[in-house]
UniProtKB/Swiss-Prot annotation:
The keyword Signal applies. One of its GO terms (molecular function) is cellulose 1,4-beta-cellobiosidase activity. Transmembrane segments: none annotated. This is Endoglucanase/exoglucanase B. It holds the Pfam family Glyco_hydro_10. InterPro entries: CBM2/CBM3_carb-bd_dom_sf, CBM3, CBM3_sf, GH10_AS, GH10_dom, Glyco_hydro_5, Glyco_hydro_5_CS, Glycoside_hydrolase_SF. It comes from Caldicellulosiruptor saccharolyticus. Residues 418-571 form the CBM3 domain. It is an enzyme of class 3 (hydrolase). Keywords: Carbohydrate metabolism, Cellulose degradation, Glycosidase, Hydrolase, Multifunctional enzyme, Polysaccharide degradation, Repeat, Signal. One of its GO terms (biological process) is cellulose catabolic process. Gene3D superfamilies: Endoglucanase-like (2.60.40.710), Glycosidases (3.20.20.80). Residues 375-392, 587-609 have a biased composition (Low complexity).
Length: 1039
C-alpha cells in the first residue's frame, strides 16, 4: 500500500498527543479531532491465556454501539458479561394478569453479539438483593408476597430468563452476594431471606438447571478473601453439593486494591474452594483500585509508583492463577478501560483499576498480565498509538517535510566509541520538545563475535532535568522481561551542553546472555518527575526528535563493565558526588577511561531472540492432480488447454504484520471466512507475507499466530506454518487459488516502508532464499498458482540514497535484475508458477540518467504503479517467458490528490494521464498480461467513488486481472469489505465490486479450478463447466 509522508508528518506536528505511529503494511494520517486509539498490534489477552482460562470483560450497553469498543472486546476477550443489562431491574418491565413482563431487547443484543462473534457470555445475575425492583416482592395491593408466592414468581422469572437464552449463555451467576459474615448464621438479611429464609438459594439453582441443563451455575460474592466469609461460602457450597443441588462453581469477584488483599489470601480461597469435588472457580469481577478502602486521597493523575505497584500485583495474581488453571476456568475484568469503571461513579473520584487507560492505551498492568502469561512477542507496541491500519501509500509530488529545527550543540571533545562489541538502537516515542514524560525505546545489539552477559552492560540517556525534582523510570515492556531492567538517575557535577543528568539503564542477571548478531528486542522506557512538571527536550544530548523508528543514535552511550564501548558522551560530563536514584537502583558506577575496542565483523542474521527452532512440519497438503497451472499467451492468461481465464481476487493481509496469520482470525473462523470469500466470487486470494517470516519458517522458527481458539478450536496447538498449511488446504477445498505476495522484508509492521528487497541485515540472498523455500514447500500443489515477487519497490532518485530502479544493469537496486534473478530461481524449482512483477515509483524521462537529482526529470506515480521501463527493458526470463505477468497498483484521490485528479477528471483523462503511459500500454500492445494487484477505497459519493467506478469499469471492459484491496476491516484509507468482526460484509461495497468478478451468463461465479466449483454454497462453477457451456472468452483488449 502507499503512504503520503508529508500528510503524516504534518499531522504529527499538529497532534501533540500522538506519541508514536504504529504501522502495518502502510501508514495512515489522523485528523486533528482524532483521539488516541488502541494499538491493535499488541498481544491479545485471551490469546495469551488460551491454554489457561477464558479472559472476559464486563461491558455496558454503549459498547455494543461503539466500533472501537467492540473491536477491543473481540481482540482481547473471549467472554463478556453485561455490566447491568441482565440484572432483574433491567429485565423486569412489570406485572401482568398472567405473570411478568420483560424488556429483553438490550440483553438480546448482548447475547447476539456474543453468539455472532463466537465468544462466551456469562449471565449476571438472577437472584440478588440489589437491583431487583421492590414490586417483585409484593402483590398487586403492595403487600409482601408469601414465601410460596415469591418462590413461584422466582421460578417463573428464572424459567423465562434462563430459558430464553438456553444454549447461548455458558454460565450464570445464579445467586449473588447472599452472605453477610456479620450475621449469626452469615446469611444476608435481604428481602429474599426475610420472606423465604435460605431456601431460595437452593431453589434458584434447581430451577436454573431445569431451564438450561448445560449452563454452568455459580454462587458469586465479593470479599471472598476474608476468612470468615470464605469459610461460610465453602461450607454452604459443600452442603449444597452434598444434597445434590446443581451448583458448578464459585465466583470470586475480586474487587481489590493495590494493598489488599494479598495474593496469598486470594490463593488460600482458591485452594479451599477447589477442594470441593466438582467445583470450578471463576474470577468474575476483577479490578484493582489505586486507593486503600476508605481513603480520602483523590488523584488527578495516576501516581506512577501506584501504577507500578498495580502492575506488579496483577502480574503476581495471574502468575498464581496459572497454577490453578485446572480449576480456574475464567477470569473477567469488571470494565474495558479505566473511565468505564464503576469505581469512578461509585466513589466520585478518579481511579485507574483496569488494564487500559481512558484512551484505550495499554497500561503497565496490561504488560504485566501479558508477561505473566509467558507469551513472547517480537515487537509489541504499547500505547498511546493511533489505530493500526493498512492504508494505501501514494507517492506525491515532493513537498517539504514539516520538522522542528534542531538546536545546534557544540562539537564535543570526547572521542566517540562506535566499533565495540555492542551498539544501541534508539526510537524516540515522544516527539514533543515540551513534555512531562520522556520516552526513549531501545534495543541493545551484540555486534561482536562472542556472547556478552547483559548484567555487565549499562546504557546512558543524557538529558537536562529542567527543574530539580525526584524522578522515576519504568519499563512498560521489554522482550527480555521488564523486571530484568534497572534504572538509576545520575546528576552531573556540573551542567554540560545538552545534559545535567543521565538515566542509566542496567540489566539483572535474568536478562541472560546476548548472542552475536542478536539484539535484546524492544525495551520500552519512560521517565518523569514526581510532580509531572515538564522537561524541555529541545537541547537534550540524547534526544533525536525525528528518529521515531529504530536507528543508531551515538548520543545514547553504552558501557561494558563501566567502559564506554558505544557512542559519544557530552563534553565534560562527570557525575556529581550525590545521585538521585530510582527505586530499582544499582550500585554507583565508576567511570573509566574511554576505550575503543577492536571492531568486530558485522553480523547479518535476522534477530530472533525469543524463538526456539523446531523441526519443520511436513506439509499436510495432499497430492492431487495438478492441472490448474496457468500460462501466458500474449496479453492473456490461459489454462492448460489454452483457454483464457480471468483472475478476480482479493487481498487479505496479516502474515506481513506480526499477526503471523490473517488479521481478523482473532475474531472470525478461518475456514468459514475463506469459504465465504470463495462463495462471494473471488477466485484468487493475494496473501501479503513477509520474507522474514518465511525465512524463520525455513529455520524451524514459528512465531506465534494471533488466533481466537474459542472460534477456531481446530487450530489449537498448531504453529504458524501449520496454520498456513491449513489455509492452503482450505483454499484447495473451496476452489480458491492463492497468489503469494512478498509484501515486506521484516515482520515488524514497518518493513514495507523500506524501498527495496533488502536492508542492512536482510540481504538480497536472504530474499531469494525465502522465495525459494516457500516455493519448494508447495511446488506440488496447484492451489498456489502465482508469486508476486515484491510489493511496491519504490524510492525517489532525486532525494533517496536507496531507491528501486529499472534498467539492464546488475546494480543492487535494479528491480528488473532482482526480479529476473528471483523469478528464475523460483521457476527452476516450480516452472509452473506465474511470476507477477510490480512496477517502481519513478522512472527517468528520455535522455535522463538515474543520477539526476531533479524531480522534474522523472515520471512519478503510485508505488508499484510505474511500469514505463517495460517498453525499453522488458523482463527476460528466457525459457520461462510464458510466466511473466506485470502488476501495477492504483489508488484514488482520498489516498492522495495526484495531479491527474484535477476537477472534472474522466475515465478517458485517467487513461491518458496515468493508466496508459504507466501500465495499460502493456496490455494494449499485447506485450504481456496485467494484474492490478491493489486498487480500492471508500465509496464516498464524491471523487474517490468516481475514480473507483472508472477503474472498475475499465477492468471489466478489458477483463484485466485484479486483486481488490482489501478484505480487512483494518485498512485505514481504503476500508475493507467486512466490519471489525471480520464476518459482517459491507454489502454496498461488495455490490459495487461484484460486477468485476468473473461470472457466466447466469451470474454464477467462475473459479480457476478444473474440477472443484468455487466455494461451498453450490451456486458457483469451475473453468470446465464454464467452457462446456460455450461461454465467451474473457479476453483483454489490445490495439
Amino acid at each position: 500500500m502507499k503512504r503520503n509522508l508529508f500528510r503524516i508528518v504534518s499531522r504529527v506536528v499538529l497532534i501533540a498527543f500522538i506519541a508514536s505511529i504504529s504501522l502495518v503494511g502502510a501508514m495512515s494520517y489522523f485528523p486533528v479531532e482524532t483521539q488516541a486509539a488502541p494499538d491493535w498490534s499488541i498481544p491479545s489477552l485471551c490469546e495469551s491465556y488460551k491454554d489457561d482460562f477464558m479472559i472476559g470483560v464486563a461491558i455496558p450497553a454503549r459498547c455494543l454501539s461503539n466500533d472501537t469498543d467492540k473491536r477491543m472486546v473481540l481482540k482481547h476477550f473471549n467472554s463478556i458479561t453485561a455490566e447491568n443489562e441482565m440484572k432483574p431491574e433491567s429485565l423486569l418491565a412489570g406485572q401482568t394478569s398472567t405473570g411478568l413482563s420483560y424488556r429483553f431487547s438490550t440483553a438480546d443484543a448482548f447475547v447476539d453479539f456474543a453468539s455472532t462473534n463466537k465468544i462466551g457470555i456469562r449471565g449476571h445475575t438472577l437472584v440478588w438483593h440489589n437491583q431487583t425492583p421492590d414490586w417483585f416482592f409484593k402483590d398487586s395491593n403492595g403487600q409482601r408476597l408469601s414465601k410460596d408466592a415469591l418462590l413461584a414468581r422466582l421460578k417463573q422469572y428464572i424459567y423465562d430468563v434462563v430459558g430464553r437464552y438456553k444454549g447461548k449463555v455458558y454460565a450464570w451467576d445464579v445467586v449473588n452476594e447472599a452472605i453477610d459474615e456479620n450475621q449469626p448464621d452469615s446469611y444476608r438479611r435481604s428481602t429474599w431471606y426475610e420472606i423465604c429464609g435460605p431456601e431460595y438459594i437452593e431453589k434458584a439453582f434447581i430451577w436454573a438447571h431445569e431451564a438450561d441443563p448445560n449452563a454452568k451455575l455459580f454462587y458469586n460474592d465479593y470479599n471472598t478473601e476474608i476468612s470468615k466469609k470464605r469459610d461460610f461460602i465453602y461450607n454452604m457450597v459443600k452442603n449444597l453439593k452434598s444434597k445434590g443441588i446443581p451448583i458448578h462453581g464459585i465466583g470470586m469477584q475480586c474487587h481489590i486494591n493495590v494493598n489488599w488483599p494479598s495474593v496469598s489470601e486470594i490463593e488460600n480461597s482458591i485452594k479451599l474452594f477447589s477442594s470441593i469435588p466438582g467445583i470450578e472457580i471463576h474470577i468474575t469481577e476483577l479490578d484493582m483500585s489505586l486507593y486503600n478502602y476508605g481513603s480520602s486521597e483523590n488523584y488527578s493523575t495516576p501516581p506512577q509508583d501506584l501504577l507500578q505497584k498495580q502492575s506488579q500485583k496483577y502480574k503476581e495474581i495471574f502468575t498464581m492463577l496459572k497454577k490453578y488453571k485446572n480449576v480456574v476456568k475464567s477470569v473477567t475484568f469488571w470494565g474495558l478501560k479505566d473511565d468505564y469503571s464503576w469505581l469512578r461513579s461509585f466513589y466520585g473520584k478518579n481511579d485507574w483499576p483496569l488494564l487500559f487507560f481512558e484512551d484505550y492505551s495499554a497500561k503497565p498492568a496490561y504488560w504485566a498480565v501479558i508477561e505473566a502469561s509467558g507469551v513472547t512477542t517480537s515487537s509489541p507496541t504499547p500505547t498511546p498509538t493511533p489505530t493500526v491500519t493498512v492504508t494505501p501509500t501514494p507517492t506525491p509530488t515532493p513537498t517539504p517535510t514539516v520538522t522542528a529545527t534542531p538546536t545546534p550543540t557544540p562539537t564535543p571533545v570526547s572521542t566517540p566509541a562506535t566499533g565495540g562489541q555492542i551498539k544501541v538502537l534508539y526510537a524516540n516515542k515522544e516527539t514533543n520538545s515540551t513534555t512531562n514524560t520522556i520516552r526513549p525505546w531501545l534495543k541493545v545489539v551484540n555486534s561482536g563475535s562472542s556472547s556478552i552477559d547483559l548484567s555487565r552492560v549499562t546504557i546512558r540517556y543524557w538529558y537536562t532535568v529542567d527543574g530539580e525534582r525526584a524522578q522515576s523510570a519504568v519499563s512498560d515492556w521489554a522482550q527480555i522481561g521488564a523486571s530484568n531492567v534497572t534504572f538509576k538517575f545520575v546528576k552531573l557535577s556540573s551542567s554540560v551542553s545538552g545534559a545535567d543528568y543521565y538515566l542509566e539503564i542496567g540489566f539483572k542477571s535474568g536478562a541472560g546472555q546476548l548472542q552475536p548478531g542478536k539484539d535484546t528486542g524492544e525495551i520500552q522506557i519512560r521517565f518523569n518527575k514526581s510532580d509531572w512538571s515538564n522537561y524541555n527536550q529541545g537541547n537534550d544530548w540524547s534526544w533525536l526528535q525525528s528518529m521515531t523508528s529504530y536507528g543508531e543514535n551515538e548520543k545514547v552511550t553504552a558501557y561494558i563493565d563501566g567502559v564506554l564501548v558505544w557512542g559519544q558522551e557530552p563534553s565534560g560530563a562527570t557525575p556529581a558526588p550525590t545521585m538521585t536514584v530510582a527505586p530499582t537502583a544499582t550500585p554507583t558506577p565508576t567511570l573509566s577511561p574511554t576505550v575503543t575496542p577492536t571492531p568486530a565483523p558485522t553480523q547479518t542474521a535476522i534477530p530472533t531472540p525469543t524463538l526456539t527452532p523446531n523441526p519443520t512440519p511436513t506439509s499436510s497438503i495432499p497430492d492431487d492432480t495438478n492441472d490448474d497451472w496457468l500460462y501466458v499467451s500474449g496479453n492473456k492468461i490461459v489454462d492448460k488447454d489454452g483457454r483464457p481465464v480471468w483472475l478476480t481476487g482479493i487481498n487479505w493481509f496479516g502474515y506481513n504484520t506480526g499477526t503471523n496469520v490473517f488479521d481478523g482470525v482473532w475474531s472470525c473462523n478461518l475456514k468459514d471466512t475463506l469459504a465465504e470469500i470463495a462463495n462471494r466470487g473471488f477466485n484468487l486470494l493475494r496473501v501479503p507475507i513477509s520474507a522474514e517470516l518465511i525465512l524463520n519458517w525455513s529455520q524451524g522458527i514459528y512465531p506465534k499466530p494471533n488466533i481466537n481458539y474459542y472460534v477456531n478450536p481446530e487450530l489449537e496447538g498448531k504453529n504458524s506454518l501449520e496454520v498456513f498449511d491449513i489455509v492452503v488446504q482450505t483454499c484447495k477445498e473451496v476452489g480458491l487459488k492463492i497468489m503469494l505476495d512478498i509484501h515486506s522484508i521484516k515482520t515488524d509492521a514497518m518493513g514495507h516502508i523500506y524501498p527495496v528487497w533488502y536492508d542492512e541485515k536482510f540481504t538480497p540472498e536472504d530474499f531469494y532464499k525465502a522465495c525459494e523455500w516457500i516455493t519448494n514447500r508447495y511446488k506440488n500443489d496447484d492451489t498456489i498458482i502465482a508469486f508476486d515477487l515484491k510489493n511496491e519497490p519504490h524510492g525517489k532518485p532525486w532525494q533517496d540514497t536507496t531507491f528501486a530502479k529499472w534498467d539492464n544493469s546488475t546494480d543492487i537496486n535494479n528491480w528488473k535484475y532482482a526480479a529476473e534473478t528471483c523469478a528464475k530461481r523460483i521457476l527452476n524449482i516450480n516452472p509452473n508458477l506465474l511470476i507477477v512483477i510490480e512496477g517502481i515509483e519513478a522512472y527517468p524521462k528520455d535522455d535522463v540518467t538515474w543520477t539526476s537529482k531533479s524531480s522534474s526529470d522523472y515520471y512519478s506515480t503510485w508505488w508499484g504503479g510505474n511500469l514505463r521501463g517495460v517498453r525499453k527493458y522488458p523482463i527476460n526470463l528466457g525459457k520461462y517467458q510464458n510466466k511473466v505477468v506485470y502488476s501495477p497498483h492504483d489508488y484514488g484521490p482520498s489516498v492522495y490528490q495526484q495531479p491527474w485528479f484535477y476537477p472534472g477528471f474522466t475515465k478517458e483523462s485517467l487513461l491518458q494521464d496515468c493508466w496508459r503511459p504507466n501500465w495499460a500500454y502493456i496490455m494494449e500492445e499485447n506485450i504481456a498480461p496485467l494484474l492490478i494487484g491493489e486498487w480500492g477505497g471508500h465509496l464516498d459519493g464524491a471523487d474517490n467513488e468516481k475514480w473507483m467506478k472508472y477503474l472498475r469499469d475499465y477492468i471489466i471492459e478489458n477483463h484485466i486481472h485484479h486483486t481488490f484491496w482489501c478484505f480487512n476491516a483494518n485498512s485505514g484509507d481504503t476500508g475493507g469489505l467486512v466490519g471489525y468482526d471480520f464476518t459482517t460484509w459491507d454489502e454496498k461495497k461488495y455490490s459495487f465490486l461484484k460486477p468485476a468478478l468473473w461470472q457466466d451468463s447466469q451470474g454464477r461465479f467462475v473459479g480457476l479450478d478444473h474440477k472443484r466449483p468455487l466455494g461451498t454454497n453450490g451456486k458457483n462453477i469451475n473453468i470446465t463447466t464454464y467452457y462446456n457451456n460455450n461461454e465467451p472468452e474473457p479476453v483483454p483488449a489490445s490495439k
